[in-house]
Amino acid sequence: MNGVGNGPNGAHVELPDAELSTARLLANTEPGGGVLDPREYQIELFERARARNTIAVLDTGSGKTLVAVLLLKHILQIELNKRANGAKPRVAFFLVDSVTLVFQQSAVLRNNLDQAVAHFFGSLGPDLWDKQTWDKHLEKYMVIVCTAEILNQSLLNGHIGIDQINLLIFDEAHHAKKEHPYARYATNYLIMP
C-alpha cells in the first residue's frame, strides 16, 4: 500500500507505507527542533525501553522511529552529563539493514536531535579504518547510523569495544535471524547468563 508524502520541492509524491511515517516526521520538524507530540502508546514504549531491552512490534507508520528518537534524547542527555563529569565518550548506534535506510534514518535523527549524527556504510570504507580513526569518530559524534555489518566487523576487529556503546537500536529487528548481525549482537553481547 502506498501513500502521499512531500518531495524535496514540497510537491506531493507517492511513497510506500514503510517510508510514510519517516516522511511525515521529516516534514513536520525543524532541524534539531524536536518531534511531534508522541501518542500515549509511544510514551509507554519509550518508558519500557528506558528501563530494559525492548523489541517494539508495531504496524508500519505507527511511529517506532519517534520512540527511538525519544529514547535517544534521553540517553544523550545522560551521556552529556557523564562527559561533563569526565567520563569517556560513549556512542549510540542506530543499526539498519540497507544503505537507503542509513540515509533515511540519519536524516530523521539529524532533524530531531541536537547532537552530532554520523552515517556510515560500506562504500565509505569503514571496514578499512583502524582503531584511531574509529576513536576520532566516537569522540566527534554522539550517534552513528550505519549498516549492521559495519558495527559487527568493528567489534570483531577490536576497533570498537562494547563498553564504548551506550545504546543499540536495531531498525527492522525482524531481520535478527540465523547469521544476521542483529542475531550475532544478541547472542554475543546482549544475552547475559
For each predicted feature, which ranges?
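Conserved pre-motif I regulatory segment
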Residues: G10-V57
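Pre-Walker A (Motif I) flank of P-loop NTPase domains
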Residues: A51-A56, K88-A92, Y141-M142
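Conserved catalytic network of the ASCE P-loop NTPase/AAA+ motor domain
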Residues: E79-K88, R110-L113, D135-E139, G158-D163, ...
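Conserved RecA-like helicase motor-core motifs
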Residues: F93, S106, L113-L128
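Conserved motor-coupling elements within RecA-like helicase/translocase cores
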Residues: P126-I144
